[in-house]
């Protein structure tokens, strides 16, 4: 799993994302006890979560800020040492340490930078590749992409190059058997429309969110693209 965040919309959307991601991680942790609801029995499941953040890149005003892999509250930047921690990024959600580390990661989220989604997905792929499923074990591999803005340097302007780079990374993930969910809280986010690459910024953003998810461009029910216009809905 991945929790990715963009930053250019500021604290308001970040404050909406934090409880949403917390609820997600708590739900995953609750599922580790299996159908019987009792920890330490045969049907326990060791669900795991890893967290990355994405924001700025090399040509941003704050170069590579908030583009990182989290291990607990520690942050390892994409441009320096993030790849060294791909192998240790996953946290076991059936253990107190794993749950505490994910809580600490969520607490360390910051809102400052751009919205280069492609780097978040690239790091997500790196973590999955560094942690192959052992022989004889079955796992569903999932990326959950949270974003509060359009892909690119400015959250209010759709950047086609950034979007296309993200779609390349999404295709890599899907070709490796990953299910990819996208969650948008930017103004105009609408999971019921296919969007339009050549339309307005909002139309293009909805097109992107459909394409990057495992909807693969076609609105579905249930959907791999989830949207919420405000914190309460999310």
Language model features: what each stretch is:
Residues 1-234:
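P/S/T/G-enriched low-complexity
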């Amino acid at each position: 799993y991945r929790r990715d965040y963009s930053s250019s919309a500021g604290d308001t959307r970040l404050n909406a994302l934090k409880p949403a991601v917390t609820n997600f991680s708590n739900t995953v942790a609750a599922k580790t006890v299996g159908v019987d609801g009792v920890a330490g029995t045969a049907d326990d499941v060791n669900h795991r979560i890893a967290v990355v953040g994405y924001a700025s890149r090399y040509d941003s005003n704050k170069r590579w800020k908030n583009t990182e892999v989290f291990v607990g509250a520690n942050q390892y930047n994409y441009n320096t040492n993030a790849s060294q921690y791909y192998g240790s990024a996953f946290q076991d959600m059936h253990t107190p340490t794993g749950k505490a580390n994910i809580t600490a990661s969520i607490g360390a989220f910051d809102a400052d930078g751009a919205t280069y989604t492609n780097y978040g997905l690239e790091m997500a792929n790196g973590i999955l590749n560094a942690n192959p499923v052992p022989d004889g074990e079955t796992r569903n591999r999932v990326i959950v992409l949270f974003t509060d803005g359009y892909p690119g340097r400015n959250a209010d302007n759709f950047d086609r190059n950034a979007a296309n780079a993200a779609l390349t990374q999404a295709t890599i993930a899907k070709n490796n058997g990953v299910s990819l969910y996208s969650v948008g809280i930017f103004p105009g986010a609408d999971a019921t429309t296919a969007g339009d690459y050549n339309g307005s910024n909002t139309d293009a953003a909805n097109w992107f969110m459909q394409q990057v998810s495992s909807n693969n461009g076609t609105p579905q029910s249930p959907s791999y693209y989830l949207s919420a216009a405000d914190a309460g809905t999310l």
